[in-house]
UniProtKB/Swiss-Prot annotation:
Residues 18-145 form the Nudix hydrolase domain. This is Diphosphoinositol polyphosphate phosphohydrolase NUDT4B. It comes from Homo sapiens (Human). Cleaves a beta-phosphate from the diphosphate groups in PP-InsP5 (diphosphoinositol pentakisphosphate), PP-InsP4 and [PP]2-InsP4 (bisdiphosphoinositol tetrakisphosphate), suggesting that it may play a role in signal transduction. Also able to catalyze the hydrolysis of dinucleoside oligophosphate Ap6A, but not Ap5A. The major reaction products are ADP and p4a from Ap6A. Also able to hydrolyze 5-phosphoribose 1-diphosphate. Does not play a role in U8 snoRNA decapping activity. Binds U8 snoRNA. The gene is NUDT4B. Substrate binds at R10, K18, K19, R20, S39, S40, R41, R90, K91, H92, R116, K134.
Length: 181
């Protein structure tokens, strides 16, 4: 069953990208197990929880709201991993945060309404699962592995004004210079 919100307002930035927010939800601060949820369109496929930002909503607040609705978890919002663009089928610009899960609800909005499931994956396994049908979601985890993990001391990312934000597009791969990673 597909999710539909009749009162949903889509928000777009100045360049026409749909504004989205998502979280990589980790079981612990070691960031070795990530929570994925089943897609509302294709229930046998796994995705990173996230969705559209509401008017006047900050990206971090939207990310926390989306994981609560889609994954039924609450947690400690951490660093902004990056802002990712998807240009192929739809123009999306997604703010992706790291969240350490502190509370797991037994029943949550999307499990009750559309039968959404959630499952913990080792990061390597999650990348493999996502690469087939959601390569941009796999890129979130690839970027995390490339040097934004807490182990290397880059645990905080300064907030950047919109015109100076770091963007990673779905077309870009591991050929990024180390200064961008």
């Amino acid at each position: 069953m597909m999710k539909f919100k009749p009162n949903q307002t889509r928000t777009y930035d100045r360049e026409g990208f749909k504004k989205r927010a998502a979280c990589l939800c980790f079981r612990s601060e070691q960031e070795d197990e990530v929570l994925l949820v089943s897609s509302s369109r294709y229930p046998d496929q796994w995705i990173v929880p996230g969705g559209g930002m509401e008017p006047e909503e900050e990206p971090g607040g939207a990310a926390v709201r989306e994981v609560y609705e889609e994954a039924g978890v609450k947690g400690k919002l951490g660093r902004l991993l990056g802002i990712f663009e998807q240009n192929q089928d739809r123009k999306h610009r997604t703010y992706v945060y790291v969240l350490t899960v502190t509370e797991i609800l037994e029943d949550w909005e999307d499990s009750v309404n559309i039968g959404r499931k959630r499952e913990w994956f080792k990061v390597e396994d999650a990348i493999k699962v996502l690469q087939c049908h959601k390569p941009v979601h796999a890129e979130y985890l690839e970027k995390l592995k490339l040097g934004c993990s807490p182990a290397n001391g880059n645990s905080t990312v300064p907030s950047l004004p919109d015109n100076n934000a770091l963007f990673v597009t779905a077309a870009q791969t591991s050929g990024l210079p180390s200064s961008v990673r």
